Structures are given as structure tokens and as C-alpha cells.
Design a protein with these regions (language model features):
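Long, well-ordered alpha-helical scaffolding segments within enzyme catalytic domains
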Residues: 130-134
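N-terminal accessory segment detector
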Residues: 1-104, 111-113, 117-129, 139-163, ...
Length: 170
């Protein structure tokens, strides 16, 4: 850590976290658009799936280490970890129907989909990427966890009360 960071107040550090999250998402979007322009949507989505399969495990492991979430910590560990993802800084998320054996996780407000809607574009069809992203993230926390997509674009109900929904079960 640089001396500059050590001297910053909490409000400034929180603002920097917000900036870092926005920059991360902007880079992800620009990378995707560059591939899409060069090779088409199908290739861009396939490469995105490959990248998210690796990144989701890296992100989960770093969150686990930083926040003392044990490997095999079940749904409780996953709920905690989801709150520390970069997305949690950018999007409105909620948990529902929490039981000992499952819970639902919803992305109520999604920065990417909101921007597309404001530009008059159709929702980005992120379901095939999301299935890999959330499954790998959850199984990195605990391999017993199964992930089911409730809805995600291009599903027709996506964007009504939430953009995507996921059920995690043990």
C-alpha cells in the first residue's frame, strides 16, 4: 500500500472502491465489445464464458481469503461472499426464500442492463455467461452447492422485478 492510501479517510476510500468497481466493469464491457466487433457476438460470448469460468474462481478465492470464509462453508459462506463481489458495489442485489438448504439471489438493478435500456437497446443476453459465472463462484466456496438459473436475459421475464435470479442449493 502506498503512503497516499494510508492517509486517506474512509469516505475517500469508499469512493475509490466505487471507482475501481466501475473501472473494472467498463474494462469488461470494452473488452467484450472489441471481441464482438472483430469476431461477432457468438465468439464474444464464448470467450466471455471462458474468461468468467476462470475469473469467478479467482474472485471467490480472494474473497474467501480476505473475509475468512472457509472452503466448504456452505450456503452461509456463499451468501457472505456474494456481498463482497465487485457487483455488490455497483448493483442492487437481494436474497429471498432463505432456508437451511437453499436461497435465491436476485440482481434487482444491473448497471449494464440499465445502460442498455437507457440507450433503447435490448437486454444483453448474459444467461449463458451467468450460468458459468455463478456456478463456478458457488462451487469454489463449496463444491456441494448447485446453481439454478431462475431467469436471466434473454428470458422474457428478466427486467421486470429483477434482471437475473439464481437459486443456490445444498
Amino acid at each position: 500500500m502506498t503512503d497516499q492510501l494510508a492517509e486517506l479517510d474512509t469516505q475517500t476510500l469508499r469512493g475509490m472502491l466505487d471507482d475501481f468497481a466501475k473501472n473494472w466493469l467498463a474494462h469488461d464491457g470494452l473488452w467484450f465489445q472489441a471481441i464482438e466487433q472483430k469476431s461477432g457476438m457468438e465468439t464474444a460470448i464464448e470467450l466471455d464464458r471462458q474468461a468468467w469460468a476462470k475469473f469467478s474462481a479467482i474472485e471467490a478465492k480472494r474473497i474467501m481469503a480476505r473475509h475468512n470464509i472457509a472452503q466448504g462453508s456452505g450456503l452461509e459462506g456463499l451468501r457472505k461472499a456474494l456481498g463482497f463481489r465487485m457487483y455488490a458495489l455497483l448493483n442492487t442485489q437481494k436474497f429471498a426464500n432463505v432456508t437451511d438448504s437453499s436461497f435465491e439471489f436476485y440482481m434487482v438493478d444491473c448497471r449494464v442492463q440499465k445502460a442498455r435500456r437507457e440507450k433503447g437497446l435490448t437486454p444483453f443476453p448474459c444467461k449463458s455467461v451467468g450460468i458459468i459465472e455463478y456456478d463456478v463462484f458457488a462451487r469454489t466456496i463449496d463444491p456441494r452447492i448447485t446453481t439454478t438459473c431462475i431467469c436471466c436475459p434473454p428470458d422474457s421475464q428478466a427486467g421486470e422485478d429483477h434482471w437475473c435470479g439464481w437459486r443456490f442449493s445444498i
